[in-house]
Swiss-Prot record:
Keywords (A to Z) from UniProt: Bacterial flagellum biogenesis, Cytoplasm, Repressor, RNA-binding, Translation regulation
UniProt protein name: Translational regulator CsrA
GO MF annotation, one: mRNA 5'-UTR binding
Similarity annotation: Belongs to the CsrA/RsmA family.
GO biological process, one term: bacterial-type flagellum organization
Any Pfam family hit: CsrA
Cellular component terms per the entry's GO annotation: cytosol
Localisation: Cytoplasm
Subunit-level organization: Homodimer; the beta-strands of each monomer intercalate to form a hydrophobic core, while the alpha-helices form wings that extend away from the core.
Top-level lineage group: Bacteria
Role this protein plays: A translational regulator that binds mRNA to regulate translation initiation and/or mRNA stability. Usually binds in the 5'-UTR at or near the Shine-Dalgarno sequence preventing ribosome-binding, thus repressing translation. Its main target seems to be the major flagellin gene, while its function is anatagonized by FliW.
InterPro entries to which the protein is assigned, alphabetical: CsrA (IPR003751), CsrA_sf (IPR036107)
SUPFAM superfamilies membership: CsrA-like
Gene behind this protein: csrA
Length: 77
């Protein structure tokens, strides 16, 4: 992990195609702009955590017996 100190107007360059700029600092809030290619998904931390939790819940393992029954039902049709 890299920890950096930046002032308003200063930027951080990640790789060749991502630029993070500190736009404003007010109290304990920092306003950033992120310039990155469209194919790179950018999420706030709490949104990313919610997506990860939803994906984990959606990845429920099926009982193998249920899959076998489904296969047999499809073959009988």
């Amino acid at each position: 992990m890299l920890a950096l100190t930046r002032k308003a107007g200063e930027r951080i360059v990640i790789g060749d195609n991502i630029v993070v700029t500190v736009v404003a600092i007010k109290g304990d809030s920092i306003r950033l702009t992120i310039d990155a290619p469209k194919e790179i998904k950018i999420y706030r931390g709490e949104i990313y955590d919610a997506i990860a939790a939803e994906n984990k819940e959606a990845a429920v393992l099926m009982d193998l017996a249920e899959l076998t029954a489904l296969k047999e039902f499809h073959i009988k049709k």
